[in-house]
């Protein structure tokens, strides 16, 4: 019987690159134990040639964050007619965008913290107007996070005192989600 060939995508260009590389190495090690023919590749300009030459039975997507979990790499794999793990293009896109996800939750009557979206137009002009807007709709403490990032990258729980300082740390993102903080035990799946 022919060994199944699995191409693992790892690394990438997101802020979660190191996490992705760790995931790819772990998956590689476990699949090798099961006697699969496995290679790891970056999702770079050589990817399509690697797919054509290696001819994987399936691509294991170990990419994290932007370009890995947001539907981008999934669309590349679809155009190459390659089977891959994890969700499809549209589901990945919707799940990665926290604002779209929240709209889906609200539409389906799933409880979710109140929120507002903050758009960085000029990082030098962050002022106390945003605090007034938050106080109108939300209560402190709040959670601030990039709309399109995963693995809890750049997530801050803020009180009134440290809010502006933490918001300025996220000035390289265009869109920020600001949610009411809900205390309790945190569980990861």
Spans of features found by a protein language model:
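ATP-binding N-terminal substructure of ATP-dependent carboxylate-amine bond-forming enzymes
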Residues: 1-90, 94-96, 100, 119-129
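Basic phosphate/pyrophosphate-binding loop/patch that engages nucleotide-derived ligands
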Residues: 104-112
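ATP-grasp fold ATP-binding core
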Residues: 105-106, 134-155, 173-183
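Short beta-strand-to-turn element immediately C-terminal to the catalytic PLP-Schiff-base lysine
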Residues: 118, 155-160
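Phosphate-binding site of ATP-dependent enzymes
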Residues: 159-189
């Amino acid at each position: 019987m022919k060994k199944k060939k699995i191409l693992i995508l790892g690394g990438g260009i997101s802020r979660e690159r190191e996490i992705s590389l760790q995931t790819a190495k772990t998956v590689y090690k476990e699949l090798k134990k099961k006697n699969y023919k496995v290679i790891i590749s970056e999702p770079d300009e050589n990817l399509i040639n690697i797919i054509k030459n290696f001819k994987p039975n399936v691509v294991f997507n170990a990419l994290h964050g932007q370009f890995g979990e947001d539907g981008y790499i999934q669309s590349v794999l679809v155009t190459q007619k390659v089977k891959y793990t994890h969700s499809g293009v549209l589901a990945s896109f919707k799940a990665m965008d926290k604002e779209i996800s929240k709209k889906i939750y609200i539409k389906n009557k799933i409880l979710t913290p109140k929120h507002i979206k903050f758009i960085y137009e000029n990082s030098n002009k962050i002022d106390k107007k945003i605090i007034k807007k938050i106080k109108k709709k939300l209560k402190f403490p709040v959670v601030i996070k990039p709309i399109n990032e995963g693995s809890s990258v750049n997530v801050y729980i803020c009180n009134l005192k440290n809010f502006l300082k933490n918001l300025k740390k996220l000035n390289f993102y265009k869109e920020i989600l600001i949610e009411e903080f809900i205390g309790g035990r945190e569980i990861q799946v």
